[in-house]
Amino acid sequence: MPPMAMNMAVRAALDEMLRRDDNVVVFGEDVGFFGGVFRCTDGLQARYGMHRVFDTPIAEGGIIGVAVGMGAYGLRPVPEIQFADYVYPGLDQLFSEAARLRYRSGAEFVAPMTVRMPCGGGIHGGQTHSQSPESLFTHVCGLKTVMPSNPYDAKGLLIAAIEDDDPVIFLEPKRLYSGPFDGHHDRPTVAWSNHPLGEVPDGYYRIPLGQAAIRRAGGDVTVLVYGTMVHVAEAAAAETGIDAEIIDLRTLLPLDTDAIEASVRKTGRCVIVHEATRTSGFGAELMAIVQERCFFQLEAPVERVTGWDTPYPHAQEWDYFPGPGRVGAALRRVMEA
């Protein structure tokens, strides 16, 4: 299996599905001739033609609306929103049309579309290029939401998303495109070629949606994470010496609640980490699930480590970003409770 950066794993998944299924089409701002701002579609237009990989105007509502119509008529569109921060003009088409089409038509029509969005901070993108809006999508019935943490998962989950008959939001942490970033911004970037999950098989494979992965087994505390925070949590556990069990959710909807429950019942403690703002973040839903299912097994209050309730600051990016120091402090608190 060749080592592969995460953006190239995304490209490999798109390449595989374009080759296997003539109904797959890929489009968005700069995804055609230019190959995407993060190179995730590099060379695909030259290989498959302008009718299957093409550029669009800067009109997110139009991009998503076109995808809904394509899906209803049998295609499998994979539109890209250049940054997750730009999706807001397209939310009406996404929430009112794509998410509800199956329900509204009695399943006569579906919207088998996968909307790719680079998300998250850590690249000095400021408030308009750093947001993590996953909780917007998990609140809407009819959408599935995925956020991979490594190249191997990115390819397998994206293939599964494209094959799904319902709309999937595929969030790609852009700080992970080049390597497994653990929050230590003052250290040299590690390449995916030095990480076991940077090895990506050639050809077709899929990872079913709704299955979490245990990245680190442990008995002291459960850490629920996804995306970039998987690597931050691993660093925090290593630096504190706490025997943490790290659960990479991978898919936020459908959510692997059985894996969450099994781990928390075992450890009796739970820390939840995400990069998005704290209030009404997805961590609040995870906390509710843990309290409902594992209340009598808990030996300490559930902790959340998140971004702050502010727009993503440019100059104070690393004060906002939940790094291993903040995560490690939360791990110590639940162990001392």
What is each model feature region?
Residues M1-P167, L171-S178, ...:
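Thiamine diphosphate
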